[in-house]
From Swiss-Prot:
Species for this entry: Caulobacter sp. (strain K31)
Family the UniProt entry places it in: Belongs to the bacterial ribosomal protein bS16 family.
A molecular-function term among this protein's GO annotations: structural constituent of ribosome
GO annotation terms (biological process): translation
Protein name (Swiss-Prot/TrEMBL): Small ribosomal subunit protein bS16
Length: 185
């Protein structure tokens, strides 16, 4: 299959292209059949020497079935030699297979995290409801149980009586070990 394509020449960072007719299997800058034009991208876009074409030779090769590449087809369309339409490939903008897998994993992780957070909120609500229910049950039990009647007796009298009993108990405790020692010996 014959192609009309660009063959790069020029130095590093200074490109210069030849427009050539070549077999599609030959290397980009390798063997070609005929040179049919030049392209110098360093010149301004409105410069006439930016693209030069041998129109008769190109028409002959197009008649023989040579297919221009996209870039060369643009140059030929500017000269009116071929009809060029902007390619529409919506698949080109889509992410690749691995990127789609990473996105799927990321969305799955996000969904799992959101589900875990929702579950934690539900568990917290359930625990709060149980605690509230337990508190209500405890309050109901406390209300149901008869409350001890507060004594109207003066508080000071029992405190003094308890104070008098405490020294007496201490004295008795001191005497008890002494009596035990004598019985053992």
């Amino acid at each position: 299959m014959l192609k009309i394509r660009l063959a790069r020449g020029g130095a590093k960072k200074r490109p210069y292209y030849s427009i050539v007719v070549a077999d599609s299997h030959s290397p980009r800058d390798g063997r070609f059949i005929e040179k049919v034009g030049t392209y110098n991208p360093l010149l301004k876009k409105d410069d006439a020497a930016r693209v030069t074409l041998k129109v008769e030779s190109i028409q002959a090769w197009l008649a023989k079935g040579a297919q221009p590449t996209d870039r060369v087809a643009r140059f030929l369309a500017a000269q009116g030699l071929v009809q060029w339409t902007h390619g529409n490939n919506p698949e080109k903008a889509k992410p690749g297979k691995k990127a789609q897998e990473r996105d799927a994993e990321r969305t799955q992780r996000d969904a799992d995290r959101v589900a875990a957070e929702a579950q934690a909120k539900e568990d917290a609500k359930a625990a709060a409801a149980e605690a509230a229910e337990a508190a209500a049950a405890a309050a109901a039990e406390a209300a149901a149980a008869p409350a001890p009647e507060p004594e109207v007796v003066a508080e000071e009298a029992p405190v003094e009586a308890a104070a008098e009993e405490a020294p007496a108990a201490e004295a008795a405790a001191e005497e008890a070990p002494a009596s035990e020692e004598t019985t053992e010996g």
